[in-house]
Amino acid sequence: DGNKGILLYRGYPIEQLAEKGDFLESCYLLLYGELPTQQEKSDFDRCIMQHTMVHEQFARFFHGFRRDSHPMAVMVACLGAMSAFYHDSIDITDPQQRMIASVRLISKVPTLAAMAYKYSIGQAFVYPRNDLSYAANFLRMCFSVPCEEYKTNPVLTRAMDRIFILHADHEQNASTSTVRLAGSSGANPFACIAAGVACLWGPAHGGANEACLKMLQEIGSVKRIPEFIARAKDKNDPFRLMGFGHRVYKNYDPRAKIMQKTCHEVLKELNIQDDPLLDIAIELEKIALNDEYFVEKKLYPNVDFYSGITLKALGFPTE
């Protein structure tokens, strides 16, 4: 309910799922329509974590890309390629194959995303570890190096987990519509998800958090904020404040409240207080929540505003 600022997954408030559950619990809920029992959760977690490895030929597949390729370009290619590696789960008329494809996508996409990141910075690929949680495993695959032991941080792991939960579902958005449109032609699940990722790439959709960080870099200094606020209010100026307002929510984005709290937890844990981008973001946040123009037009900070800052703090480059 965009007018009331409410988001439910299968009838459960997003606040409840993000605070008390983990991402795989939300996955189970979205797939099966009900929250799992303790045994069902344990079985589902084990099923996902035992399928995190990808075909070894994917390593060679990555070497066909330039190192400076945009990660979304790489992900579109990798997801499409999954249908070439996993022929036994592409028949959409078979419910069992559809579920196998779902499990493979949930389990292997973090591995492929981490490989895309590692390839872009010239580091060795890191194999997944099934004894770690879903989010901890992803962070380890992204940031561990062979020459030293990687230690998981519970605060950062929880932040990553919340980011996954908050982005798991959001009604009939552009990428969901794209996946369903591709699926209506009878295309296999991997091809459909690849199409959805291509749509997600756009700055008006999933690319908004990257665009938000680039905007903060463009502003450059807290002193220049009034200049950019004035430009945002000028109808004749093409400049737009990224990370504010939402097409669905005419009230505060419920995901933004959770992400705001998570963002500050991460920054406190990492003792980040002198980041100029963060200073700009905090000042912009204050203005947006108090300036009559923004309040009247209900241009509150959205989930992309906080997730971009959080991901940057976790160590992910803007691009």
Swiss-Prot record:
Q: Which GO BP terms apply?
A: tricarboxylic acid cycle
* Listed EC numbers: 2.3.3.16
The UniProt record lists the keyword Transferase: yes
What domain of life is recorded for the organism? Answer: Bacteria
Matching InterPro entries: Citrate_synth-like_lrg_a-sub, Citrate_synth-like_sm_a-sub, Citrate_synthase, Citrate_synthase_AS, Citrate_synthase_bac-typ, Citrate_synthase_sf, Citrate_synthase_typ-I
- Signal sequence range: none
Instruction: State the GO CC annotations.
Output: cytoplasm
What keyword terms does UniProt attach to this protein? Transferase, Tricarboxylic acid cycle
Describe which pathway this protein belongs to, using the record's wording. Carbohydrate metabolism; tricarboxylic acid cycle; isocitrate from oxaloacetate: step 1/2
What's an example of a GO molecular-function annotation for this chain? citrate (Si)-synthase activity
Q: What else is known?
A: Citrate synthase is found in nearly all cells capable of oxidative metabolism.
Q: What is this protein called?
A: Citrate synthase
Origin species:
Bartonella vinsonii (Rochalimaea vinsonii)
